[in-house]
Curated annotation (Swiss-Prot):
UniProt KW keywords: Cytoplasm, Nucleus, Repeat, RNA-binding, Translation regulation
Name of the protein described by the UniProt record: Polyadenylate-binding protein, cytoplasmic and nuclear
PROSITE patterns the UniProt entry points to: RRM
Keyword Cytoplasm: yes
Length: 502
């Protein structure tokens, strides 16, 4: 059936803007979320390094679904961030924006909407949060018209602020530098310092005397062991930020107790003290920046030198100590049938980093495990081009080396005469790893699909894909949302075949 182009809605009315996205968000995530509203034709995701947020354009088949998505997903949270959803033509410049601070801790984007909707039509609003979803105490409201924002400022000035949830909030016209400045305010000024690398026999009084040469110390946390000896670290809180900076400037990297005195042998360490959540937030941002720059700080790990007899269950029980495992598969080393390898995917890069650091210390039946970040074909080609790369070990079977086979159901590469792998088989193996990683997203459909785990799921999907052209296979490898759509179609086709047989 042909569609009369004159009756088709304009592309702008079919497309919505989705902003404030986490770097963790993939186009497949957006496709899955908005497919609950209606048929999604395309997702165009624009990834940007923090602190600038990523955004996307989602195009629906009809205008009603696009409008419904804006209404129903106005305050939706994805990867611990409240996303911004609006019409494509209502994006910034943000002339109708206001900045609201001193918000109650439990205040949400919906609460902001309820509080300010009396002043005019609101396009979007959000409360800034940490990666764990905790409010930072400030937020932003964007009105459709600038005069509504000015009306808010005028009213709040005459009322000398307004009490919301017990807090007297402050409202200002949005300044692009405010958002950047607020996020850096805490790290810019501090008084608490973390200290280590002092002599084993140093006393609390001795350390305090040293620190107070540079400013008044209001408190000193100096933990000791059961035998009375110091644990080797301390926290000092100075009266003001300048004193803390002065101590760091004059003491860090020096030997204030004398180089010959019994101690760690390392220079004195004093730096800004951070709460656990602050350290986690900085680490998260570091991983996101590195990931955006194409570095191998990922969630997928490749483990080798595993003795035979250790399956997914045994390895999972060992590696779950380091974080939440989303998928795991074990394969047999083609070069040595008595050794195995595994792929493990964690829910966050931070967890994967811990597993790499500590996993290499694990011995199984006398075999020391070799744990590294999974490298795709392009990364390995670059390593080879520039001299082999760090951590490359000849003889260790990478995913595309000859002899690769999966323990479950025997998925193998196709070969040319003489043992060389066919290019098409190469692509299928790469696609297999992507389907394997996506398997947990379809867990609710495993039973109807007739599979019980990730490997069975991936193998069955790949069998369905074998009839596809090489061009289709490459599209699925390159575009997450295309892969997601094709997996869903494979499941649907399988269910349809079952109905026919019945």
């Amino acid at each position: 059936m042909e569609i009369d182009e004159s009756k088709r809605a304009s592309s702008d009315s079919l497309t919505i803007y989705v902003g404030e996205l986490s770097p963790k968000t993939l186009d497949s995530d957006l496709f899955r979320v908005f497919s609950n509203v209606g048929k999604v034709l395309s997702v165009k995701l624009i990834k940007r390094a923090e602190p600038v947020s990523s955004f996307a354009f989602v195009t629906f088949e009809n205008e009603e679904d696009a409008e419904r998505a804006i209404r129903e997903y106005k305050h939706y949270e994805l990867h611990n961030r409240q996303i911004r959803v609006m019409k494509k033509d209502e994006r910034p410049p943000e002339t109708g924006n206001i900045f609201v601070k001193n918000l109650p801790e439990d205040f949400t984007g919906k609460d902001l909407d309820d509080a300010f909707s009396m002043f005019g039509e609101i396009v979007s609003c959000k409360v800034a949060t940490t990666s764990h979803g905790k409010s930072k105490g400030y937020g932003f409201v964007q009105f459709k018209e600038k005069k509504a924002a000015k009306k808010v400022i005028k009213n709040f000035s005459s009322l000398d602020g307004l009490l919301l949830g017990g807090n007297r909030i402050v409202v200002e016209l949005y300044n692009p530098e405010i958002k950047k400045g607020e996020s850096k305010k805490t790290s810019a000024t501090f008084t608490n310092c973390f200290i280590k690398n002092f002599p084993f026999d140093a006393s609390e009084a001795e350390l305090l005397e040293l620190l107070e040469r540079y400013g008044k110390v209001t408190s000193l946390f100096f933990p000791v062991k059961d035998n009375g000896k110091p644990k080797g670290f301390a926290f000092a809180n100075f009266e003001n930020h300048e004193s803390a900076l002065n101590a760091i400037k004059n003491l860090h990297g020096t030997f204030p107790f004398g180089a010959g005195r019994d101690g760690t042998g390392e220079a004195f360490y004093i730096q800004k003290g951070q709460r656990k959540e602050e350290r986690a937030e900085e680490l998260r941002k570091m991983f996101e920046q590195m990931s955006m720059q194409g570095q191998s700080y990922k969630k997928n790990l490749y483990i080798t030198n595993i003795p035979e007899g250790f399956g997914c269950e045994e390895l999972g029980s060992i590696f779950k100590e380091f974080g939440n495992i989303t998928s795991i598969s074990v394969g047999v080393d083609g070069a040595n049938s008595q050794k195995q390898y595994a792929y493990i995917c964690y829910s966050t890069p931070e967890e994967a980093s811990i597993a790499v650091e500590r996993g290499n210390e694990i011995y199984l039946d006398g075999n020391r495990l070799q744990v590294a970040y999974f490298k795709n074909k392009l990364e390995r080609m670059k390593e080879k081009e520039f001299g082999g790369g760090l951590g490359y070990k000849p003889g260790v079977p990478y995913m595309y080396n000859q002899g690769v086979s999966f323990a479950s159901r025997g998925f193998k590469r196709e070969r040319n005469r003489g043992g060389a792998a066919k290019p098409y088989g190469n692509e299928l193996e790469k696609l297999h790893s992507l389907v394997l990683a996506a398997a947990p997203s379809f867990k609710s459909q495993w039973k109807d699909f007739g599979v019980g785990n990730e490997v069975e799921f991936a193998n069955k999907v790949i069998r369905a894909f074998r009839s596809r052209s090489e061009e289709e296979i490459k599209d699925m490898i390159d575009l997450n949302f295309v892969l997601t759509k094709n997996i869903a179609s494979a499941i649907e086709d399988d269910n349809s075949n079952d109905q026919v047989l019945l």
